[in-house]
Amino acid sequence: MPAATAAPSGARIATYNRVMPDPERPASFRDLTVAAFVDELASGAPVPGGGSASAVAASLGAALVAMVAALSQGRMRWAEHAELHAESAATGRELAARLLDLADEDAEAYSAFAAARKLPRETESEQAARRAAMQAAARWASDVPMATLEACLSVVSAAESLAGRCNANAASDIGVAALLGEAAAHGAAANVLVNLPSVGDDAYAAEMTMRVKRIVDDIQQLAATAHETLGQGESREPLRT
């Protein structure tokens, strides 16, 4: 599972609470109701935005993985896949929690970049400090959606593993998990790529661009396999170990 991304040192970080300083608002998106999060997303505030929305969508996909695995546990018909179901249930829950954290981190990273842009730039030293802060924040704003993208790969991979090896009554649910993971991946990829030009590091940008393409390709292949399996009904070859 992707490691936590670190905030850039030296940058003036404007956190989610500073962007939206209402003391009645919770410090984390996970503490909002679904309706409240949707309202925040629809508001004119800069956060949450597409990056946070992508992470939340992927979190829902991960939760569906956990749900389908749980619905499949203890069923004699699927007993040969009991280990897969146990692992998938745990993995789905872990990914769902991690992706909610990434939704918060995405808002914080954007806020850091917005704060850096507002730094003074009257003197050469101020301009240099502002540029360095913006580049550090842009790197952070690229690293966070990259972590989301990697988590999306884990979500879709888990969904693909369960397709055809789970409770048949939940087949559509695992299909939705794959769809959410794939859609969220495209959103995360877009957020990585849009921030790379502001990092000021061509080698880093090239490496990240290649990683994005590779991961998105892998996700699309896994999702296609999952949907093909689900479209063929309940039959599937057992896992190879």
Region locations from a protein language model:
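A structural-propensity feature for long, helix-poor, extended segments
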Residues: 76-119, 215
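Short, hydrophobic/aliphatic alpha-helical segments
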Residues: 29-48, 167-168
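Long, charge-rich low-complexity segments
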Residues: 105-120, 223-241
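Conserved phosphate/anionic-ligand binding catalytic regions in large, soluble enzymes, centered on
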Residues: 43-66, 170-188
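Amphipathic alpha-helical interface segments
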Residues: 106, 110-179, 183, 195
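Preference for long, well-ordered alpha-helical segments
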Residues: 151, 155-158, 169-238
